[in-house]
Regions:
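Short, Lys/Arg-enriched N-terminal segments with co-localized hydrophobic residues
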Residues: 3-23
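N-terminal intrinsically disordered, cationic/polar leader segments
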Residues: 17-170, 174-202
């Protein structure tokens, strides 16, 4: 038998989900203006966006309709009008808007390296990381990503694809996440690292 508290929590969750779905539906109805110097091509639910900062291609499930009308991208649910289609089209609209922004102005993530002897440098299409291990770490830089290294300890990851920029940033950080005692490692600029006191020997 459900308690009053459980019933209340279920009602709150349902209300929250309904509110989020309505918000995404409102977002989905908003056209996406195509800026100057940006080209959008749509073929069989695959969207290609090109601009000054590069190009991004993504394929979406055929539960939404994507069209260009009056130099704007319009996203709408497919004719079956399923609950999934109605829930998805706001998300698809947000992703495409992010693609347009990415090729127009780009996305960036900044990292910093802390630790004695820890540093990074570029070797062609590879990032060379010295992070206190017995061997350097060589990471291939994917197409569509630019990495800049300043003074060996400051890195900037740039690209038109927001998801790819985030993935590359996360990979670099994963090689030596900031440890909580001395704080050394690779961290995203602005990241808060919870520090711990080291154990003392009696």
């Amino acid at each position: 038998m459900a308690t009053a508290g459980a019933t209340s929590r279920a009602a709150n969750c349902s209300a929250t989900f309904g509110k989020e779905k309505r918000t995404m539906s409102r977002i989905g109805k908003q056209p996406i203006p195509i800026p100057e110097k940006v080209k959008v091509d749509i073929k069989n639910h695959t969207v290609l966006v090109e601009g000054p900062k590069g190009k991004v291609t993504k394929t979406f499930a055929p539960v939404v309709n994507i069209a260009i009308v009056d130099n704007k991208v319009i996203v709408s649910p497919s004719e079956d009008s399923s609950r999934f289609a109605k829930a998805m089209y706001g998300t698809v609209r947000s992703v495409i808007a992010g693609m347009v922004k990415g090729v127009s102005v780009g996305y960036t993530k900044d990292l910093e390296i802390q630790g004695v002897g820890f540093k990074a440098n570029l070797k062609g299409k590879q990032l060379d990381l010295a992070l206190g291990y017995s061997h350097p770490i060589l990471m291939d830089i994917p197409d569509g990503i630019k990495i800049t290294v300043v003074e060996g300890t400051k890195l900037k990851v740039e690209g038109a694809d927001k998801q790819l920029v985030g993935a590359v940033t996360a990979e670099i950080r994963s090689y030596y996440p900031p440890e909580p005692y001395k704080g050394k490692g690779v961290r995203i600029v602005g990241e808060r690292v919870r520090r711990k006191e080291g154990k003392t020997v009696a």
